[in-house]
Amino acid sequence: PYWYRVDPKSWSPDNPGEYTLERLNSSGSEYISQSGIGRGADNTFYFHGQLNYENTFGEDHGVTAMLMYMQREYRNDVLPNRNQGLSGRLTYAFRQKYLAEFNFGYNGTERLDKGKRFEFFPAMSLGWVVSSEKFWQPLEKYVDYFKVRGSYGLVGSDETGSYDGAAHFLYVNNVNLGGGGSYSTGPTYSSIYKKGPSINSYAVQNAHWERVKKMDIGVDMKLFNQVDITFDYFCDKRDRILMRRASWPALLGYVSATPWSNIGKVENKGIELGVNWKKEVFKGFHVDFRGNFTYTENKYIDKDEPAYPYVWQTETGKPLSRTTGYIAEGLFRSQEEIDDSPAQDGIGSAKLMPGDIKYRDVNGDGKITEDDKVMISPYGTMPRIQYGL
């Protein structure tokens, strides 16, 4: 910053309220900048209170209930992360054969504007222990336990956009007082140099919680009193994902401060299989074998994108971790073939020679550029199949 002192020649005890400031340093700024403050420790404050209820009515009806209040503050930087919420669970079982469960969460976050900080997230699940029915008795020697279940509910997240550079407080502007253009005033030997403000990110006052609509259908069974098998089909539809408005043209002047909005939608679905075999080979000695298998796939349902010139450049409807690249059409056989093919000087630094890879000119403009990249694999770096023993 600039440093000043009172010019002793300009001050008089007869008029002490009038004086002239004399600048001491020749360069500086009219504001004080503050860089990030490093921390060598994290701390968490967590408080929760919980009430539980459990009762059985007669021999057929069982009820349990839980109500919990939670308050959390996590600090690993100058600004802490604060959350508050109320959650509950109610379960009902009829003869331990027909099962129902209702859960809810009423959660709040400081990241959103007033009126949008709290949201309600309910969930419901049903189960049927088929092996408890009388008609199952002939099968008990093969299948000791068989249960079908299903659930559907909403889950919320306030971390939306935080890993992609969104501000902590989404509802306020993030301003850098010295990040804008600059100007100088005054004579050359004592000019005043100033920089204007710049906007790092604009306030998103209508931001909401990110949501996931989760659906699961599963089966639990036990075979020959030794093998436990669990199978699930799941489908998660995530919406209100906070993303920058990529469709807004640069001529609007936002540059790196393009506004954020809850516009993203992603679908993730798949199956999970778990097998556990346990047997007592002889007294005191057990053999335990566990295995699992998971298959998942995902895609963008909706994503705000620029006005790409070619349809193959869009991401909506495609997997998140897909691989893009050029389509290889073989190898160049001669220099004559190189001369007659679309120019691909922009790929690699070496001069093309016979034996180099020949790429397809997808858009037909006579040269190989970034516009010729297409999705060459839907799998990418994230495996769809995972398994373990």
Which stretches of residues belong to each language-model region?
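Surface-exposed, low-complexity loop segments enriched in small/polar and acidic residues
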Residues: 1-48, 60, 64, 74-75, ...
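Outer-membrane beta-barrel signature, preferentially recognizing the C-terminal barrel domain
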Residues: 79, 177-228, 257-282, 317-324, ...
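Extracytoplasmic loops and strand-loop junctions of Gram-negative outer membrane beta-barrel proteins
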Residues: 28-37, 72-73, 105-109, 130-135, ...
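Solvent-exposed loop/turn elements at secondary-structure boundaries
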Residues: 137-211, 230-266
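Surface-exposed extracellular loop regions of Gram-negative outer-membrane beta-barrel proteins
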Residues: 1, 45-72, 81-113, 117-134, ...
